[in-house]
A protein has these predicted regions:
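Soluble "head" domains of membrane/secretory-pathway proteins
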Residues: 2-13, 28, 32-33, 37, ...
Length: 246
């Protein structure tokens, strides 16, 4: 009794099948598990830097229509929903401009009263503790300016670093606002250089959340182009690769 050898398919059939499965697996991975994002601005300095690349867990808060590519399955709300925690670094779609992704820190939960006085965040009338850890000169584009780094401690005990150029800039004093049900309030860690819920972004609906930022998988300082291979070892921030995002 002889075994017949399975006939191999021609390459022009095998190749499209391989591409189809590869694309399908990538879509499932990005839609339901982890999606990569890059950091284009300094609004989350010192936590995240321009040139950082990170993975966002899509399953952390459940799924909405924005979890899928191009919103191909339109539905409202979230399925398998899980409540985010104060202090999470979150990627979300900007309200009113849902084609734009933002990444900020969640500071206000539904029902919270949020305000900023003299640069200090207040939650439900209580000032959030912050302690200065360092200061130095930073490049903010056209000028070099003195900045202070603080460690901020939320009521739940979670800590993170923030950067302040001054305590009297345009968004360092805001009127108290109450976060509506089904919405969240976000701020950038670079408090004087962030478009967030204090202005422009406003309250973010729960269905606009994409996921929680987890860890960096790559980082570079932008000082080497794709073709300047000899500069890559000096442009890559090896100390940031694999760093978790707190």
């Amino acid at each position: 009794m002889s075994l017949s050898k399975k006939k191999e398919e021609p390459w022009y059939i095998e190749l499209p099948k391989t591409i189809f499965w590869a694309v399908g697996i990538a879509i499932v991975f990005r839609s339901f598990l982890f999606e990569p994002f890059s950091i284009p601005s300094g609004s989350m300095i010192p936590t995240l830097k321009v040139g950082d690349y990170l993975f966002v867990s899509k399953y952390s808060y459940g799924y909405s229509r924005y979890s899928l590519p191009f919103g191909i399955i339109p539905f409202s709300g979230r399925v398998m929903e899980s409540t985010p925690e104060r202090g999470d670094v979150v990627v979300f779609r900007k309200p009113g401009a849902e084609h734009i992704d933002y990444i900020k820190r969640l500071v206000g939960l539904p029902g919270d009263e949020i305000s900023v006085t003299g640069g200090i965040l207040h939650i439900n009338g209580e000032p959030v503790k912050r302690v200065q850890v360092t200061q130095g000169l930073v490049d903010i584009g056209l000028v070099i300016q003195q900045a202070k780094i603080y460690e901020e401690t939320l009521a739940e005990g979670r800590t993170h670093l923030i950067q302040e150029l001054s305590d009297q800039n345009s968004m360092d004093n805001t009127v108290p606002v109450t976060v509506p049900e089904g919405h969240y309030f976000f701020m950038g860690d670079n408090r004087d250089n962030s478009r967030d819920s204090r202005a422009e972004v406003g309250f973010v609906p729960a269905e606009n959340l994409i996921g929680r930022a987890e860890f960096l998988f790559f980082s570079h300082n932008g000082k080497a182009s794709f073709f300047e291979v000899w500069k890559w070892p000096f442009a890559i921030r090896f100390d940031r690769i694999g760093k978790s995002i707190d």
